[in-house]
Amino acid sequence: MSTQITSESPDGRQRRWQMLSRFRRDRSGSTAIEFVALAIPFSLMVFAILESCISFAGQQVMSNITDDIARQLRTGQIRPADLDKDRLEGMICEQLEMIVADDCPGLEVDLQEYDTFAEAAAVRIKLTGTGDNRDLDTTGFNVTPGPSMSKNMLRVFYKWPVMTDFMRKSMSNLKDGKTLHFATVTWQNEPFDD
């Protein structure tokens, strides 16, 4: 059995060229309608993916900021006596503003000293309300860092707005279409002069 290799006939090339020319001349609009029908859901998916990525990046930035501030507290670079709620929020917001709205409107902080690590581990995030009316319960939130050798826990929360409308139901867990981002660090201070 032998295989024949033949070149394409001039008639075949001409037929293909005519078909492409006919397609180019067709202005009936079906291609445009098909494109729009596919472009809208594709665009929505792209925006949802981008929003998820930006949200994740915001969570990571917040986590890094929390780790950095906890390290400064642990080593005594930031003295407990010099720290109050406004200063702590300002330190966090200063770095977080590159990815969130000015003045960090959804920022909540809780920094407290604990007797044991087990006591700190027992603290839970509490939400008030039910369904679409849930919100972060900030009752008991303080900024009271402990002295040298004390055990502390810093919790940072941000109410992140979900922008993509059709993703709001599945991504948001707080009222007003927001989702709760948080970072927690627990540590024991190093020996430093109080």
PLM feature segments, named:
Residues 2-10, 68-194:
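Short, conserved structural patches
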Residues 2-95:
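Alpha-helical assembly-interface signal, strongest on the long, hydrophobic N-terminal helix that forms
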